[in-house]
Amino acid sequence: MKTPRLPIAIQQAVMRRLRENLAQANLKLDRHYPEPKLVYTQRGTSAGTAWLESYEIRLNPVLLLENIDTFIAEVVPHELAHLLVWKHFGRKAPHGKEWKWMMESVLGVPARRTHQFALQSVRRNTFPYHCQCQQHQLTVRRHNRVVRGEAVYRCVRCGKPLVAG
């Protein structure tokens, strides 16, 4: 799927939110953390990722276009919080107490680990598998590993191997 073109107004709204959150954090933490690089190259079902070493936030343009307001209000500060935790505390658990504190006390945003966006437009084909207790959907990559005999996946609930079909 080709990456959609983001209107400049949306990019500006994202940057505005990022700068507001960063200014707020710098003020509350009495620091001068730099502005991270923002790129719109995230793919798949992830709304965004924070890359610590390159100090970069990657955002999913498809999910952004489909959920503009919620995406800007939640995903941008979520990813910024990861970078700020890394700068302020060093390497910590991705959604640990430091991240939660950064989200809620510093940025004033509810600390949610995952988004609730509809994923139909970004979800790849999946393959049905089952165990004794439920149905599962495996990605193409996992399905191919099963077919080649490279992997056996088990249900986290019952522990039984997953079977195609």
UniProtKB/Swiss-Prot annotation:
The UniProt GO MF terms for this protein read: zinc ion binding
In terms of one coarse class, where is the protein primarily found? cytoplasm
User: Would you identify the family this protein belongs to, as annotated?
Assistant: Belongs to the SprT family.
Q: Which protein is depicted?
A: Protein SprT
Q: Which Pfam families match?
A: SprT-like
Q: Which InterPro entries match?
A: SprT-like_domain, Uncharacterised_SprT
Q: What keywords appear on the UniProt entry?
A: Cytoplasm, Metal-binding, Zinc
The superkingdom of the source organism is: Bacteria
- Please name the source species: Salmonella choleraesuis (strain SC-B67)
Q: Where is the SprT-like domain?
A: 22-163
Q: Which NCBIfam families match?
A: PRK04860.1
The organism that produces this protein has a lineage beginning with:
Bacteria, Pseudomonadati, Pseudomonadota, Gammaproteobacteria, Enterobacterales
Q: Write out the GO cellular component annotations.
A: cytoplasm
Please list the residues that make up the active site: 79
